[in-house]
Amino acid sequence: MILKSFLLGNLVSLCMKIINSVVVVGLYYGFLTTFSIGPSYLFLLRAHIMEEGEEGTEKKVSATTGFITGQLIMFISIYYAPLHLALGRPHTITVLALPYLLFHFFCNTHKHFFDYGSTNRNSMRNLSIQCVFLNNLIFQLFNHFILPSSMLARLVNIFMFQCNNKIIFVTSSFVGWIIGHIILMKSIGLLVVWIRKNRSIRKYIRSNKSFVSELANSMSIAGILNILLFVTCVYYLGRMPLPIINKKLNNLEKMDQAKLKNNTPLSYIYKNQEDLYLEILGKKDKEKSFSLFEKPILTFFFDYNRWNRPLRYIRKINKNLSVRKETSQYFFYTCQSDGKKRISFTYPPSLSTFGEMIARRISLSTLEKLSADALYTEWLYTNKEKNNNLNNEFINRIEALETVFLSINILDTKTRLCNVETEKKKNCLVNKKNYLVKMDDPFLTGMYRGRINKLFSSSIINQISIENYEKTYELNKIHYNLLPYPNSREYEHKIDPNSPDYEQKIEKLEKIQAQIDLNNRFIFLWTTIIAKLKGQKNSSRINEIGKKPPRWSYKLINELHQNYKKRRKEQGIIQGLRHQLRTRKYKHIYFLNRSTRTLETLKQSNLNNSNMDKKFNNKDLGFISYLEEPDFRRSLIKGSMRAQRRKLVIWGPYQGNPHSPLFLEKKQDFPFPISDLIKLFLNIKDRLGKKSEFEILNKQSPPKRNNQEDVMEFWETIPHGHKTRGILLLAQSTFRKYIKLPLLIIAKNIVRILLRQSPEWDEDFQDWNREIYLKCSSNGLQFSKTKFPKNWLRGGFQIKILYPFHLKPWHRSKLRLYDSDRDLKQQEDFDSCFLTVLGMETEHPFGPPRKTPSFFEPIFKDIDYKVEIRKLNFRVRRIFKKIKKKEAKAFFFIKQKIKELLKGNKIPLFLPREIYESSETQTEKDSIISNQIIHESLSQIRSTGWTNYSQAEEEMKHRIDRRKTIRNEIEIMKKNKINNAESSQKILKILKIKNIELLVKFFIEKIYIEIFLCIINMRRIPLQLFIQSTKKIIDNDKYINNNETNQERINKTKQNKIDFILSMTIKRAFDNLRNSKRKSDIFFDLSYLSQKYVFFKLSQTQIINFNKLRSILQYNGPSFCLKTEIKDFFGRQGIFHSELRHNKLPNYGMNPWKNWLRGHYQYDLSQITSSRLIPQKWRNRINQCQTSQNKDLNKWYSSEKDQLLDSKKKQNSKVYLLPNKEDNLKKNYRYDLLSYKYIHSETKKNYYIYRSSLETNNNQENSTRNKEKFFSILKNIPSKNYLGKSDIIYMEKNKDRKFLYKINKNIKVEPNKDQIKDKNKDQKKDKIHNNGLFYLPIDSNLEINYKKVFFDWMGMNEKILILNCLISNPKVFFFPKFVRLYHKYKEKPWFIPSKLLLFNLNITSNFSENQNINGKQEEYFLKQEEYFLKQEEDFLKQEEDFLKQEEDFLKQEEDFLKQEEDFFKFRPSNSKQYFELNNQNNIEEYFLESTEKLKIFLKGDFPLQLRWAGRVNQLNQKIMNNIQIYGLLLSLINVRKITISYIQRKEMDLGIMSRNLNLTQLMKTGILILEPARLSLKNDGQFFMYQIISISLVHKSKYQSNQRYQKQENVAKNIDKKNSDLLVPEKILSSRRRRELRILISFNLNLKNNTGVDRNTLVYNENKIKKMESIFG
């Protein structure tokens, strides 16, 4: 048994019981209610954040208790009905809570109201605590605003219907809410702590530090909370409509006087009907006046029937009001269903209220409820009885069918409606029945089925009544519906037929029934008679109970209905109604304007018509057109909340069209339409692809939309579109009429006068006066000249021009016949038009502009006409000449013929000629024409007497035959021509198709060529192309610089051919690239400067050997090989002079770069740098990712022979390496070593990778230096752009680099050396050699007196010690030899690369060249270690002294706090009295000193930030907070109010403010650290290149000497003269690209001549060449 209890099923059931228990469910719902946060949390958080001390803890406790009690009241209100009604009734919370909230907000904004600062405890303590308690208690009763529907809070109320143990449920839900509240508060605290500790979030907070500090100082936390409270007030007012200030909706339609007169009953008591009408109106007014006061006060202020939600209003045509759809159609009540008690949601509410009323009056004994089992058994019993009855009836019918006699009850019969007609058939009357269709028969269809009372005989009635009365019947229908379980057998009664009183009871019932029938008949007759007499309907005696649908108390109308009722003013409706529904934007379009003139003419014509006034009212007939645009306000009711509107959701920041949330997924949110791209692709495919010979259009093209509609919609969619269009039309009309046309007339007539023609002033101005401007509606309906149409600014209007004026070149007095018809047609076409906004003419309103008759067209036509006449005259003359020639020939021919005829027989001249010819000639002609003629004999033809007749007949036959033959031949020719034409057409089609294919191929090839050309000219050209193109140019062109500046060039003896074509193509590519960059914005990032471009520019400007181009460039005539643009380009760049005066190459060390700088003068603008500030972190991030760092900077200037083998130094640099891949680094170095040994195997010299040495003259001139030109002053270069204060900051920088400038006892921080000034300008300067771009000369002389120097600039002083440098930074303690370099880097970080701190440095010394500098450095650092150990002991002593000073500070703070309290207690209102009470002189002196210090402090530039040193652990954070507050107070104007607020909130501590402590003391003690403000400038690649080259050319810096440096002149004189590094293309490339460059160069080395250059014997020196190395070696 014990094991059975531990079965799985029992455990599951136990768990389910626990989960479904009241306690667990209450805990669950209570826990959920914590997430429905209300405004009370603001007060709770305010108390927990702001309050401190004892009073703060009390306020926290009061806030939490008030918060908990408020929530407890809310839970109790669920169980306790009065509280629930008080808190849940509509508008009670808004009436009570909102005024309190607003009062609290406006009162709490005052700074001294319920102040949470330092106040007297006895005065305000109790009241403030009570106010905190009340705030948290009252605001807990408000609605929740984070979850607007408050669903989580309402779940508790919903569960109360199902819960029986209500008290347990309330307590458990309250406990669950407390648990959730505790978890929520703890999670908020942990979140705040996590934000403070997390650095990734703190950096975002620090980035907005200035904004946060300004916000904190401008307003307190209490002010922020007050703003949040005000937002909640607005939120509450926004979510619910204002209960008092609402729109009064008018629902009464007042009838007009005429209607009331017609509807009043006629009576002869009053002589005048108007008196009766006035009396009726007076009664109605009285009723209205009293009805206002009869309304209750709540309904007067709060109208619950008005429209709060923006629901759709469905207007009824009839007079009934619209049905309210927002009321619930469901009413929940218990009823019996299937033998069990269930909740019905369609129970009639009236029946439930009636049942409750009866249940109160009926005794409790009758209302006893049966158990569920008894009720179910009763239901089963009744169902069995019904089943048995049906079975018995069915069996009885089956048995009756077996019998012979048919009874009535065997089958179910149905009656049908029919029409009986009698017909005579064979002397017999036959009844014919015509039945209705089943669909139309009311007896068969369900809805229209009626009941027919069957008339039976008395015997049948008695028999049926007896049978019915024997059956069961119910006592009362009310018991069935309302009393419990009326179907039970207790309420059933039967009459026993065997009882002795059976017959008596039936007789009584029959008598009662007969009396009832008589009474019913009498009542029916009486009611019908009275109804007929009174004209009323028959009132049925059965009152049907029906449910009236809930209707709105207002009848709302829209704007259209309002305008319609305004127009029906004469028909009985008054104009006072206003619309409440917003309709879609529309406008009236009129197509018939019935003016007063037309009405008068119609009335005169129809004098007999008396109804003319009614038929033809002075109205404009038209229709309404809606605009095709989205409308958010459509069908909205005024006063409803748009934010709660359904089906239209605003889901984006800007939404032009209303969208339903159901269709958001189908909406395409792509930035470009895909359909347009598909269409474009298909069009290109159709153009390029093959087309069929005959294109068949299967698809019908969609009809094009009218342009007028588009223009109309355009002006309607624009805000105030019609207004602007109307003003423009008026302006164009006045401009056209009075300015444009008169000027044209004047200009035309002046030209005619100049051409000596008569002017046409009168004719032109007559045409100008004919032009008339009419104002029309938007659709072109005419109005008049002066009057505008109604609402012409909103709906728009048109200007119609009648007889528009067109300038003509001349006016004809009499028109010709052919010109008159043409001019009449033109006048009909241009009789009227409409004016456009641009001053043009259109035929239709909003139509396209039409062509106007041109002024010059008739002139050109006249000229063409005259030219054609002249041509005709010329042609006619030629024709007449030809005719004359032919006539002369013909006349001569006729003469000859006449002579011939006169010589022969005399034949009549006018007879036919062929008759008298011989037969032989005739047969010859006939044989020529055809062979089908039948030849007759001469005997037959020459019959006597008929000779003339026979010859004529024969001639006719002959002609007929010839015509036939000619026709046959013509038909044959036509057939041949048709065949030839078809074949030629086929050939032409084939040729066309082939031509199209060839054109398409040519077009595609052209596109491919352009694409490949674009790809070739892209910016990302491979680097090998540049290396190969410049390899032959760079090959063996090496220069040797002498100490003199005007050094001659060393020419080569053996010149190689230049690949000039390749270099020109590269040059063009880069010209295109440079032009594209010039067109774009000049301010771009340094990271976009490619190495390829820099390499090309350097190789182009320096290393080209111009001896190869001497013959081309030196030729002054027209060159066939080289363009003049290339010569000009070389001349502008300063690389090669166009005249070639110097036969030698320019100096490699100095002149080429100066000339290049002169050519790039466009970067010589210092104003550009001011406009390139961009965010600092972004710049650092991009530059950090894109800058390439050199691996082997530790190998600079070392005297080792083979620096590549130093593997220890290689391991220090791990650039471009991924983790766990150090083997790649070793492989790269081995490959470098192998390649360099192979390249320089024959030269046997120690070629260094990153060094190109050149000897230069170290002597430089002495000159004064101006401010802010430390890097830009070059010799013989007019440079205005310089690296000033703004440029030094970003010279060297990493992502998280911080420049910490410490102001210590013996160290000076200088942001720029330009601040050094010297009065003696002619003194000698200290020589500093710029051996490289970032070369750092370090003086190794250690015997300098540093005690007298306060600011040690780059002095490397041994005795200078930084406080706490060993303890605060343990890395420095273990590596003391780097301390000196580390602090020197902090002094001047913008000039020294960060990697030079850990690598070998070039230390100038007095030793000889052969001594090892690294060995001296090691000895020096060993001495430094000993020295630091001694200084450590001194530092510990100084630290003890500092702790003592700190204790003194704390004592001073306590004293100052006491003085502060006395100051605020006894401070008088007037400041002058205060000065009189104390020592006036001392205070005035103190304030004067402080003001002077402030002025001096504000005048200076402080691009630095203050910080405490990390070693001061005992100082409180309040010191730093005070310093921040002081800095903010300095920048404010009204300092007094803000300082008082800081002191009241205890954010400013007055004890720390001591008068004796100065900034200089803090600097001497080393407490403060200065951090510079970081700026960021954006420069392009050319600008950086310009600056770098300008720096590298400064051989000797023109510094002015300090006294300390004047003592070291002897040391400076002995400084070694060393070769300076020149910036060559090799250094700009990356390490891998350098390797490729050197390998390619090595293949073209001339090993026989190691120097690779032609030597000039005048300059050549072998001793010097031994010290040289190749430029790229």
UniProtKB/Swiss-Prot annotation:
Compartments it resides in: Plastid, Chloroplast inner membrane
Protein family (similarity comment): Belongs to the TIC214 family.
Taxonomy of the source species: Eukaryota, Viridiplantae, Streptophyta, Embryophyta, Tracheophyta
Pfam families: Ycf1
Topology in membrane: Multi-pass membrane protein
Protein name per the record: Protein TIC 214
PANTHER family per record: PROTEIN TIC 214, PROTEIN TIC 214-RELATED
Bridged cysteine pairs (disulfide): none
Gene Ontology terms: biological process: protein transport
Summary of the function given for this chain in its UniProt record: Involved in protein precursor import into chloroplasts. May be part of an intermediate translocation complex acting as a protein-conducting channel at the inner envelope.
Spans through the membrane: 18-38, 67-87, 90-110, 127-147, 175-195, 218-238
GO CC annotations, alphabetized: chloroplast inner membrane
Alphabetically ordered keywords of this record: Chloroplast, Membrane, Plastid, Plastid inner membrane, Protein transport, Transmembrane, Transmembrane helix, Transport
Subunit structure as annotated in this protein's UniProt entry: Part of the Tic complex.
InterPro entries reported for this sequence: TIC214
Gene: TIC214
